[in-house]
């Protein structure tokens, strides 16, 4: 198959674990692993699928930064949109101020996805909640 993967990891421990797994499975020719913060990485390649599983407070930044790398009929998937069920709670129910701020950011991202006319986004209760945003091709 011609499938290739580019993945970005900023946590050194996770990066080294991924590197070990890629070598163990002999997938070095198919998986490119980048050790960096994704917001500091510039990619020129185009992708059919982009998967965002990163700092939840920055999901809009990740989406806007990497959508230029998405093929015209591509899809962006975002993980952990329920954030351990906290997104479904009223703000007053969340004791930590930092968690409230993070939940607010996730809710802003969900609104961003719902309002983005360039994508058809569906939300699923799978795991901790995911969104699947399919780019609407221009005619």
What is each PLM-predicted segment?
Residues 1-139:
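S-adenosylmethionine/decaboxylated-SAM
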């Amino acid at each position: 198959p011609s499938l290739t993967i580019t993945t970005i990891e900023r946590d050194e421990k996770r990066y080294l674990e991924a590197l070990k797994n890629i070598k163990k499975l002999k997938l070095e020719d198919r998986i490119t692993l980048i050790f960096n913060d994704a917001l500091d990485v510039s990619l020129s390649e185009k992708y059919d699928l982009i998967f965002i599983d990163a700092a939840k407070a920055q999901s809009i930044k990740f989406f806007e930064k990497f959508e230029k790398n998405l093929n015209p009929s591509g899809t962006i998937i975002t993980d952990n949109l329920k954030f351990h069920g906290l997104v479904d709670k009223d703000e007053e129910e969340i004791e930590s101020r930092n968690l409230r701020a993070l939940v607010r950011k996730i809710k802003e991202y969900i609104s961003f996805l719902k309002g983005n006319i360039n994508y058809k986004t569906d939300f699923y209760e799978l795991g901790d909640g995911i969104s699947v945003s399919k780019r609407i091709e221009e005619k």
